[in-house]
């Protein structure tokens, strides 16, 4: 039995768009199902953690003693660390989607400057415009 050799390109399964953002070209990759699932999970975790932090903030204001407030503040710091880790994971997903053609530092700087919500808006705008251009 002979072993046949095959070569396959995945480019037809992955959508990318060249986008000029603030004077620099990026190749932006559309999220696949796995990336969408990761993003959805992280956004859900972020919203849950945000709710917990807001609830804890209210409890701290109602604390009866300084010791009680200090304990809650310490718990709050741990939750803030968790919140920041989730934000970092979401940003990492976006950084991976925005290829700056270099070492990724420009992509990271862009994502950090925009924040998650505005990065999502830019991402959506890129693919909305690409879809409109394809129809024309």
State the predicted function of each range.
Residues 2-20:
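Short acidic, Pro/Gly- and aromatic-enriched capping/linker segments at domain boundaries
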Residues 3, 14, 24, 31-136:
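Short, surface-exposed, charged amphipathic helix/loop patches that serve as local interaction elements
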